[in-house]
Amino acid sequence: MDGDTLLDQVERAERALVDASRRSVRTDGDRPDTQERTVQDDFDAIIAAEQKIEPRDWMPDAYRRTLIRQIAQHAHSEIIGMQPEGNWISRAPSLKRKAILLAKVQDEAGHGLYLYAAAETLGIGRDELVAMLLEGRQKYSSIFNYPTLTWADIGAIGWLVDGAAIVNQVPLCRCSYGPYARAMIRICKEESFHQRQGFEILFTLSHGTPGQRDMAQDAVNRWWYPSLAMFGPPDADSTHSEQSMAWGIKRFGNDDLRQRFVDMCVPQAEVLGLTLPDDGLRWDADRDRYAFTPPDFDELARVIRGDGPCNRQRLAHRRRAQDEGAWVREAAAAHAAKRSGGTP
Ligand code: FAQ
């Protein structure tokens, strides 16, 4: 739709969410009176009516497990995702840039917290989720296993990584699980600002000295393919897409979203005056979309398995932060217990 920005889509999803909460769900269906309704029938009716499943509702175990996996992976990504950018907080080129970056990294901590809270509504504790991350039993996004070598990488992360995140996450604002959908609306509004700040960093560099321009181009060259890989394996190799789409958790396949991202980035790269590192990139008039060279999915598989450039460093840092923060969590629990008159 012309002029339909990602933020317009988020606002539409927000309105749909409010409307859905006002409609009552018909759970009687066409079933004859003689046949007893099952909780599965009610669940199916809610999904078919595009209503939201709420924590109090019955849901199939596999639906619950899929949500826990995806929401936890998403939460872990936000928290681990603070590391590559955190690397540049003390080296930002001006006080203003530093303040903006600090605020962005704090937003990511906030996103992690909304998401852990959404996962907790499914009956699993945050401690348990964090333990699963640290023991390597849950994943986080492949993208955060790449290093941030120059200041331009902060621009490339904002433009490309937040850009990919928002293309992937806007449809999640219409996810069938209410707490996740509501968290995503808030997150997407903030991600949109993040993407613009990344674009602005790159725009400044690409219109600066030749050295700054080269630095911006080099960052885009390194972050382009890892960003395309963020959308996951091709649909044919995606384990969960089909079922997740049937449940209204995912709304689109990985390849479709990857294509939307490419179509969004090409004109933006032109405005930046930077090139995307793909000789195969060209307008395909028959499909009304850009043709592009896909990412190296073997590399994605290696990074997911733990063999990317920074996997070990990221997890070691997270483990250290968890250990060093233990006293803060204990003190907070003791303080809360004291205020409520109990023991921790
Ligand atoms: N990295 O069957 P599918 C952000 C795994 S937040 C690692 O297609 P699904 C904000 C997948 O888990 C970025 N693993 O899976 C920010 C599955 O493994 P399993 C995070 C990946 O779930 C910006 C297997 O491969 N966003 O960037 C990846 O249907 C800047 C088969 O894949 C989200 O988490 C990958 N890239 O689709 C923060 C969004 N791709 O569990 C800081 C929510 C796939 O069977 C700075 N998540 N895998 O062993 C989703 O939309 C989906 O989970 C997908 C994957 C699309 C990521």
Residue ranges and their predicted role:
Residues 57-63, 81-103, 165-180:
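Helix-loop segments that flank and shape redox-cofactor active sites
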Residues 1-63, 95, 326-344:
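Extreme N-terminal leader/anchor segments
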Residues 175-226:
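Glycine- and acidic-residue-rich phosphate-binding/metal-coordinating active-site segment common to enzymes
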Residues 2-21, 214-344:
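Extended, helix-rich structural scaffolds rather than catalytic motifs
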Residues 52-72, 132-158, 175, 208-212, ...:
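Acidic/His metal-coordination segments adjacent to aromatic residues that form catalytic metal sites
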